[in-house]
Amino acid sequence: MNSLANNNKLSTEDEEIHSARKRGYNEEQNYSEARKKQRDQGLLSQESNDGNIDSALLSEGATLKGTQSQYESGLTSNKDEKGSDDEDASVAEAAVAATVNYTDLIQGQEDSSDAHTSNQTNANGEHKDSLNGERAITPSNEGVKPNTSLEGMTSSPMESTQQSKNDMLIPLAEHDRGPEHQQDDEDNDDADIDLKKDISMQPGRRGRKPTTLATTDEWKKQRKDSHKEVERRRRENINTAINVLSDLLPVRESSKAAILACAAEYIQKLKETDEANIEKWTLQKLLSEQNASQLASANEKLQEELGNAYKEIEYMKRVLRKEGIEYEDMHTHKKQENERKSTRSDNPHEA
């Protein structure tokens, strides 16, 4: 019977401890959700966070202190009945819950400060970005100081043992939340990269002219050297052309002015000679055309006379045929007479 009564008493006490722990956890969860909503809506600014961080930490410390007092009262009442294992388990759970809530609070503060820093950076430029970065660092440091003050206020032996156990469990809690912190760090890095991109894409400030090379000595020297190179090439081209012109002239000159004057005179003479030759060639062409026309008319006359002579020859042939004389016999008779005349001229004594 005693064992049953003790078991019932332990179960009721466990239920009370569990309900108290659940109430504390619900309060802390509601507080963290409210903070996250305020952070998402952008209602918290850097100044309000700087002023309210102490009160938030104090309220968090008061909540933790209340839960610790509930746990201590429950533990002291059940110290004779429950073993050391149950005490260590409840203390460990309370420490883990407190550590998680504190970490969420600090992380929410850092996120809100980062969001405020990005807004101020987009509004004010790169110079204010560095100042906001410093402000983003200071709240996290200020958030640690109230914790030390709260720890100094709790100086009882029971709380010192509780603090030592919490210190032993903090690394375990941080190890359990490692992936979440790693994800938060990656999100912060992505936010920083996006912030840098936004800053780089911002237009330049008005009223500031970009620094050009036109005012530097190096640019002036480079421009002077390029001008000298252009002038040198121009003179080289002129000298080359004058030398070629001097080679074409019949008289060799030394100075450039004499070469140009002689070239102008020589070109003028060539022009006059060309004009004279053109006139001469024109006259010759006209004469040749006239002679060609005369020769053509004479040729036509000769052709006409030859035609008439051919007609007379044909007429004489017909007459001779009528008389019984062949044209060929007459031709041979004339040939024989010519031979006789030639022989008589060669032998005058025989005649």
UniProtKB/Swiss-Prot annotation:
Span list, region Disordered: 1-164, 196-233, 327-351
Modified residues (N-acetylmethionine): M1
Subcellular location: Nucleus; Mitochondrion; Chromosome, Centromere
Gene Ontology BP term (one): positive regulation of transcription by RNA polymerase II
Function in brief: Required for chromosome stability and methionine prototrophy. It is involved in chromosomal segregation. Binds to a highly conserved DNA sequence (5'-RTCACRTG-3'), called CDEI, found in centromeres and in several promoters. DNA-binding activity is enhanced by MET28. Required as an auxiliary factor for transcriptional activation of sulfur metabolism together with MET4 and MET28.
Note: Present with 6890 molecules/cell in log phase SD medium.
Keywords: Acetylation, Centromere, Chromosome, DNA-binding, Mitochondrion, Nucleus, Phosphoprotein, Transcription, Transcription regulation
A Pfam family reported for this protein in Swiss-Prot or TrEMBL: HLH
InterPro entries reported for this sequence: bHLH_dom, bHLHzip_scCBP1-like, HLH_DNA-bd_sf
One Gene Ontology MF term: RNA polymerase II-specific DNA-binding transcription factor binding
One term under GO cellular component: kinetochore
Protein name in the entry: Centromere-binding protein 1
Start and end residues of each bHLH domain: 222-270
Oligomer and partners: Binds DNA as a dimer. Associates with MET4 to form a heteromeric complex which also includes MET28.
Modified residues (Phosphothreonine): T138
Annotated positions of the Phosphoserine modification: S45, S48, S84
Compositionally skewed regions (Polar residues) per UniProt: 1-10, 43-52, 65-77, 100-124, 138-164
PANTHER family linked: CENTROMERE-BINDING PROTEIN 1 (PTHR47787:SF1)
